[in-house]
UniProtKB/Swiss-Prot annotation:
One of its GO terms (biological process) is tRNA-type intron splice site recognition and cleavage. This is tRNA-splicing endonuclease subunit SEN54. Non-catalytic subunit of the tRNA-splicing endonuclease complex, a complex responsible for identification and cleavage of the splice sites in pre-tRNA. It cleaves pre-tRNA at the 5' and 3' splice sites to release the intron. The products are an intron and two tRNA half-molecules bearing 2',3' cyclic phosphate and 5'-OH termini. There are no conserved sequences at the splice sites, but the intron is invariably located at the same site in the gene, placing the splice sites an invariant distance from the constant structural features of the tRNA body. The keyword tRNA processing applies. GO terms for cellular component: mitochondrial outer membrane; tRNA-intron endonuclease complex.
Amino acid sequence: MTEAEELSVALGLHDSDAEEDALAQDWSEMAKLVKKANQHALPRRGEKDYEPDGTDAQALLLHTAKETMFGTLLNSVRGSTVKTLIKAYWEEEQRMARIPNARGSFTNTMGKVDKHGQCWLQLHEFVYLVERGTVSPYLALTVGDEKSNHEDVLLSVQDVYALFSSTEELDEFLVYAHLKRLGFIVVSTDNPPAHVTSFYPPLSQKSSASSNWFCHIHSWLKTPQNLFHVPLYHPLHFLLHRYTSSPQLYEELSQHIPFKKVPHDINELREERNNGILNPNVKQWKIAFNVWKPKSSFKKKTPGLPDFQVVVYNKDNAGQQFPTYDEFRSIFHRLDYRFDFLNELDVDDSAWDDYTYTDGMPTREFMQRNKIAPSQPHSGGDSRKKKARTYPQHIAQIRRLKSGFKSFILSVIDDGLVSFVRIAESDFGSSNIWYTPPSQTGTTNNRTRSDKVDV
């Protein structure tokens, strides 16, 4: 044996060359390991496939992904189990939906339960739950004279939408569904709770008559002042009054411009409510919904004052016109919610119980009589409460003029699109926004601006 043959035998080259043709290299196991290691890792760099490149590899991957998706949808079990099925029967006479055995979290904020344990839903609540798939809509038909013999007729979504009897009901449903999808708690004013809470004390007929007499006497006492009042532009006025500065002129001019005095505190709010008289010739816009912010302590029977109140306006309805000034005044007069401009009450939920009335009595007394737990303040103690930010006088005045006092939400529907506009009651008449020079008693170098603020 030569030296070359001995070297090849030692290295094993002769056997490997012979087996190379018979055995093929198998990379499948290695590919599985690599695929398993990288199946959760996404490429962080490099170009991504965001458009077709015409290759067979990409077409195969896309076909495989589609087949997997459609196969999952096709082979999935459809329908609902009998245990979780909630049937809602539409009662045309009451124009409400009845759920014999209501269960689910929606019962915390929707519907009313009667003494038989049945939950009754308003039309907009019924349609909203049908859209979500929470309830299955049925129409109960009485067969024969026996009331207990019913035949269930399943309704489609088109049938449910056909239950609306007017465009106003459909508009209110659009607003209701939009607010519910945003997470708010929405209750229609047509369906008041069992115990109604109001910011205003109950007004008896005797006190109402006395307040009307007070208004007449007050207007009669102001008559001599109006008779002997000299207009500003009359020459006789400057013989009786002397003006030595520009602020005095502005002050006098502001008294000659008519404006509506806006209530700023609790007493002014209640005084305006008691003394105000609604004009019967003015259209009374409906306050459609009371809205609460999402909270776990909400109770349907005693919800308390709402956080917002909503008025619905359909721009496409030829029978509706945008509210006029008098109609806005009527809406502001009927508002009853948590007025956010009352700083003395903007502490926690329990503070409002001392200033509200439930079923004609103070809320504290009502809760003690019915053994209802009071509203708990926010956890964290006084040390964790967020301190109110203070602003300079002129900045605070601008913020107050911008935000206003009483306000409501005007929901505008335009071609099925719902928009929300906040309409606020501002007070430009009693806010002096002109420049007032600094006093002479200060330092000589004091040339800072001093704004007079009455808000």
